[in-house]
Swiss-Prot record:
The gene is glgC. The keyword Nucleotide-binding applies. The lineage of its organism: Bacteria, Bacillati, Actinomycetota, Actinomycetes, Mycobacteriales. It comes from Nocardia farcinica (strain IFM 10152). Belongs to the bacterial/plant glucose-1-phosphate adenylyltransferase family. This is Glucose-1-phosphate adenylyltransferase. It catalyses: alpha-D-glucose 1-phosphate + ATP + H(+) = ADP-alpha-D-glucose + diphosphate. Pathway: Glycan biosynthesis; glycogen biosynthesis. GO terms for biological process: glycogen biosynthetic process. HAMAP family: GlgC (MF_00624).
């Protein structure tokens, strides 16, 4: 029986998330609220903790206050057994400069690796929505003998040009790592599908440290994990692919097995929320066998008064619907929808208030937005464009704290 390997988790959470503006105007992308009760960072941390990995460093940088606070308050572990989940802001250990890329973030944090001295390091992104058992990927990595293993999700070749793509042979060795190619490669067993990189990696420690140090000396590098480190290891013959379809999460349904969403744009963020609200959701937040953990707020239950109605909705704690109609929507905590108001196909973040008789359709309202009596959002997009951000898909986004 193989002894348990010593694994350190590094979560790359410094993303600025420009394509999610205005949701990222005041916070880092991994801190953006999601699903009525979570932040994006909670999905990767839940996956790692559920797998038993309890020594995790979260590298932060861009507007990280709310993210650092959330990690410190929500993800506290007992230190008696050496367990920790700690936010690590840019330390400027190598001089007065910030991180210049994801690989540079690890370069500036090598002291964390030296202190922990792990056998293997999982390096995961912080801004995707999915369930995964990372321990299965680590076991695959150890058995394969690769220096780095890249998680790949199967996507149709016709859609793969939007991703970093993996070309591999039948043994799982990666032969090419291509950034958004015009002609994506097929998988060894299906020419109509392509392995897209999920941005999740497992490294043998020496391989990661050596490659990070070599990259730091390369003045032509962008110091990016996917753009520089992985291609260099592919060229050296040290990279393998892990098929995400092989990952078996306890409690997963046939419908949500293999679910993974990059929510880097407003339209993708909106669509991922709509995946949550059907009777048989595409992604099931209610899997008790592999829970997604978030901040536990001390709030009263949601209240429906004077005939308030919610259909195909998620409604957060402390929310009140008073003689209002809400359909196909996600409401976070402390949302109030007043008499006669209608909310359809929308995402309302904590503290939002919808006034009497107001109408909100296909919209994302950030925290503490107040919509006045009789106001209309999401019906006249030309008018909305003069006031708010409107995505290519017609989703209206109202920034944090705006009074309409």
């Amino acid at each position: 029986m193989r002894s348990q390997p010593h694994v350190l988790g590094i979560v790359l959470a410094g993303g600025e998330g420009k394509r999610l503006f205005p949701l990222t105007a005041d916070r880092a992308k991994p801190a953006v609220p999601f699903g009525g009760a979570y932040r994006l960072i909670d999905f990767v941390l839940s996956n790692l903790v559920n797998a038993g990995y309890l020594r995790l460093c979260v590298l932060t940088q861009y507007k990280s206050h709310s993210l650092d606070r959330h990690i410190s308050q929500t993800w506290r572990l007992s230190g008696f057994a050496g367990e920790y989940i700690t936010p690590v802001p840019a330390q400027q250990r190598l001089g007065p400069r910030w991180y210049t890329g994801s690989a540079d973030a690890i370069m500036q944090s090598l002291n964390l690796i030296y202190d922990e001295d792990p056998d293997y390091i999982v390096v995961f992104g912080a801004d995707h929505v999915y369930r995964m058992d990372p321990e299965q990927m680590v076991s695959h990595h150890i058995d394969s003998g690769a220096g780095v293993t890249v998680a790949g999700i199967r996507v149709p070749r016709s859609e793969a040009s939007a991703f970093g793509c993996i070309d591999s042979d039948e043994s799982g060795r990666i032969t090419q790592f291509l950034e958004k190619p015009a002609h994506p490669p097929g998988t060894p067993d299906d020419p109509n599908m392509t392995f897209a990189s999920m941005g999740n990696y497992v490294f043998t420690t020496k391989v990661l440290v050596d490659s990070i140090r070599a990259d730091a000396e390369n003045s032509d590098s962008d110091h990016d994990m996917g753009g520089d480190i992985i291609p260099a290891l592919v060229e050296a013959g040290e990279a393998g692919v892990y098929d995400f379809a092989d990952n078996q999460v306890p409690g997963a349904t046939d419908r949500d097995h293999g679910y993974w969403r990059d929510v880097g744009t407003i339209d993708a963020f909106y669509d991922a929320h709509m995946d949550l609200v059907s009777v048989h959701p595409v992604f099931n937040l209610y899997n008790k066998h592999w829970p997604i953990r978030g901040a536990a707020e001390n709030l009263p239950p949601a209240k429906f008064a004077q005939g308030g109605l919610a259909q195909e909705c998620i409604v957060g704690s402390g929310s009140i619907l008073s003689a209002a109609t809400v359909r196909n929507s996600v409401l976070s905590s402390n949302v109030v929808v007043d008499d006669g108001a209608t909310v359809e196909g929308s995402v309302l973040m904590p503290g939002v208030r919808i006034g009497r008789g107001a109408v909100v359709r296909r919209a994302i309202l950030d925290k503490n937005v107040v919509v006045g009596e009789g106001e209309i959002i999401g019906v006249d997009l030309d008018r909305d464009r003069e006031r708010f951000a409107v995505s290519n898909g017609g989703v209206v986004t109202v920034g944090k704290g705006v009074w309409v």
